[in-house]
Amino acid sequence: MKKGVLLNADISAVISRLGHTDQIVIGDAGLPIPATTTRIDLALTRGVPGFLQVVDVVTQEMQVENAYLAEEIVKNNPQLHEALLVLLTQLEQRQENQIALRYISHEAFKEQTKQSRAVIRSGECSPFANIILGSGVTF
């Protein structure tokens, strides 16, 4: 049995295949997922698993260089936005790097998901609880 924090085989496989600048998306239950993109559906019921919980576990396995958020999260989901910023700051400290954070419109965000290797769907049911994570290198 795997000893690490991340036990989901599909997510683990996607992360192990990421190269520098490849992207994955962690989304809420309502984020549209392009038909051509790998879907990893974790949603069990409303709020389970939560968005931040999924981001926390995934980023313990993935080296993150940059991230995209929908700019709408700032006004429409300020508590989640603040919690996510704390999580990203902690990740920067663990990784000993700076994560470039970019805000784009939700429409542009949805377009950008088409470039990702996978979309991980959480059970989160709050507005704009989505992030695109760009893969970095560990050296």
From Swiss-Prot:
Pfam families for this protein: RbsD_FucU
Recorded metabolic or biological pathway in which this protein acts: Carbohydrate metabolism; D-ribose degradation; D-ribose 5-phosphate from beta-D-ribopyranose: step 1/2
Alphabetical GO biological process terms: D-ribose catabolic process
Cellular component GO terms, alphabetical: cytosol
EC number(s) on file: 5.4.99.62
Active site: H20
Listed Gene3D superfamilies: RbsD-like domain
Keywords linked to the UniProt accession: Carbohydrate metabolism, Cytoplasm, Isomerase
Compartments it resides in: Cytoplasm
Taxonomy, superkingdom: Bacteria
Keyword Isomerase: yes
SUPFAM superfamilies linked to this entry: RbsD-like (SSF102546)
Enzyme class, UniProt record, top EC level: isomerase
Assembly information from the UniProt record: Homodecamer.
Name recorded for this polypeptide: D-ribose pyranase
